[in-house]
Design a protein with these regions (language model features):
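Glycine-rich FAD pyrophosphate-binding loop
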Residues: 1-19
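General small-molecule cofactor/ligand-binding pocket signal
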Residues: 2, 233-235, 419-422, 454
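A short coil-to-beta-strand element that immediately follows conserved catalytic motifs
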Residues: 314, 413-425, 488-489
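C-terminal lid/capping helical subdomain adjacent to the catalytic/cofactor pocket in oxidative enzymes
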Residues: 423-424, 433-504
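Active-site/ligand-binding neighborhood in enzyme catalytic cores
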Residues: 102-105, 109, 113-246, 251, ...
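Mid-domain catalytic core of redox enzymes
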Residues: 212, 238-397, 401-410, 489-499
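Dinucleotide-binding Rossmann-like beta1-alpha1 core, especially the glycine-rich loop
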Residues: 20-125
């Protein structure tokens, strides 16, 4: 078995970047799944903590510890249990994420706006719109007023398109069962003494998650080490440039190393997580060679669909600051001097800012930050297009822009508080649901015609899956290979089951 990784690091957008003793989680990854196979596998790779972490001990926080589990203060291979706190920043106010009918929300909105939003939601309950786009999907679940406040501008910021131009499929996969009724149902069930299973909790409403001591990249670094110990050949800086076929099956791939050298690798079964666009264009890419008589490049209509699949690219700027101007006005204890806000994420849904989300790495894991008591390590997430003006900024320009936004938001006092910075750019971070996306079924049929080729993962299926769904596609692919199952419907159907979309 051979694994080819295009870059020098494993994990893709789930990797962890190390910078001057601090660590950045590129996309922010909660380890939580309704699929017990995934949860069990995670804790096999990194066992759950059996003793309190640094901040748990210092703040007196309680978690259910794993009997016999490792102590994160003395051992590195450990999965932490973390409390989830996320909020929305809109109109200079903080709201619960997801939106709830809490006293804080009602106070921040005011009586008049609350009444308008309430009647708007009631109208949406009795007058359902056809869910032929993402805008209608949101309005049906939250009403037009809340949609216009919290979803319309943020979605356009994320995708660069108005929600009316985006397929409702994205909402079905990412928002799933979330709605005002779902929020109320969850609030009521929390009052009951019975402990609920993961499958009974809407993913967007979870209150606790797991997280590797040193970020998600630690998990994939551990997996790489385990694979090599088991005899798997792992190659980095190995970009697949051609997929060769014979008689309707993939026979080999050609990969290129960092020095431009090309090597052909033959095999019996092939699992691809490379972007669909790149995969289709790589199929017999040397077919234009007149001597390559057996080659059969992808049909023109399939390359048309593949090349039309859109992506949203991503830039994250890390800022190490002395302290926050933003005060912790919650009842949740935190580290810091003064104590920092408790959020893992802050969703910036205010259209006056380009930043989409803030991460406060101190709250994900205290071990991500070199000096967790006296500095705050923040990540600003920006959505853009490769080659646009924001993408092409220098590190200095992007850092200056990020500092200005945090200062305007009154999160920090200004550039005088910034101690260090780092920028990361990620291509094809988010598969998008417009342009030729509606023709994906044609592409799936074509790719499935290669009996020994399995497409898995977010970009491998051009589906905005969570990490656990991406892993489940690989598990299903391996199951098919081992059993001899020829249909790949189970691989493509991960995260399309109605249990993820509908209220139970």
């Amino acid at each position: 078995m051979t694994v080819l990784e295009e870059t020098q690091e494993f994990g893709g957008i789930s990797r962890t970047v190390k910078h001057n003793g601090n660590r950045m989680d590129i996309g922010g990854h909660r380890f939580f799944s309704k699929d017990d196979r995934i949860m069990d596998w995670w804790k096999t790779v990194l066992p759950l903590q059996g003793a309190p972490s640094y901040d748990d001990k210092k703040l007196g926080r309680d978690h259910d510890m794993e009997p016999g589990g490792p102590d994160p203060e003395t051992e590195d291979k450990v999965m932490l249990k973390r409390h989830r706190v996320s909020r929305i920043f809109w109109n200079r106010h903080f709201f619960d994420y997801p939106i709830s009918l809490s006293p804080n929300t009602l106070k921040a909105m005011g009586f008049k706006l609350t009444m308008v939003a309430g009647f708007s939601y009631l109208k949406s309950m009795f007058h359902k719109l056809p869910e032929d786009n993402l805008e209608n999907f949101y309005i049906n679940r939250f009403g037009r007023k809340l949609y216009s406040m919290f979803f319309e501008g943020y979605t356009e910021k994320l995708w660069g398109r108005h929600p009316s131009q985006i397929s409702a499929d994205w909402g079905a996969q990412r928002v799933k069962g979330l709605s005002i009724m779902g929020v109320l149902k969850n609030a009521f069930q929390k009052l009951l003494p019975k402990k609920r299973s993961n499958a009974e909790v809407e993913t967007s409403l979870i209150e606790e998650f797991w997280y590797p001591k040193y970020g998600p990249g630690q998990l994939w670094e551990t997996v790489e080490s385990n694979c090599e110990a088991a005899g798997v050949k792992v190659l980095t800086d190995a970009r697949v440039v051609e997929v060769r076929q014979t008689d309707g099956a993939v026979s080999s791939v050609v990969y290129e190393d960092s020095e431009g050298n090309r090597t052909e690798l033959s095999g019996d079964q092939f699992i691809s997580s490379m972007p669909v666009k790149d995969l289709v264009n790589a199929i017999d890419a040397a077919g234009a060679d007149p001597e390559a008589v057996d080659s059969k490049p992808a049909p023109a209509d399939m390359t048309e669909v593949a090349n039309g699949l859109p992506y949203r690219d991503f830039v994250t700027v890390g800022l190490l600051v002395k302290h926050l101007k933003l005060k912790n006005t919650t009842s949740i204890p935190t580290l810091g001097n003064p104590p920092i806000v408790p959020d893992c994420w802050i969703y910036v849904q205010d259209p006056g800012y380009k930043v989409g989300r803030l991460q406060i790495f101190n709250n994900w894991s205290p071990y991500l930050v070199k000096d967790v008591d006296d500095t705050v390590w923040i990540g600003l997430e920006y959505f853009c297009e490769e080659g646009d003006s924001f993408w092409n900024m220098t590190d200095e320009e992007a850092t200056k822009f990020a500092i200005q936004e945090l200062t305007r938001m009154q999160v920090i006092n200004g550039p005088q508080d910034v101690l260090d910075s780092h920028r990361e750019r990620v291509k094809k971070a988010y598969p998008a649901y417009f342009d030729t996306y509606d023709r994906m079924p044609e592409l799936v049929d074509y790719l499935d015609s290669f009996g020994n080729l399995y497409c898995v993962g977010r970009n491998g299926q051009h589906r905005y899956n969570n990490m656990d769904h991406s892993m489940a596609t690989a598990i299903e692919a391996v199951k098919d290979i081992k059993s001899g199952e020829t249909s790949k419907d189970n691989v493509w159907s991960v995260n399309t089951d109605k249990s993820y979309h509908e209220e139970k």
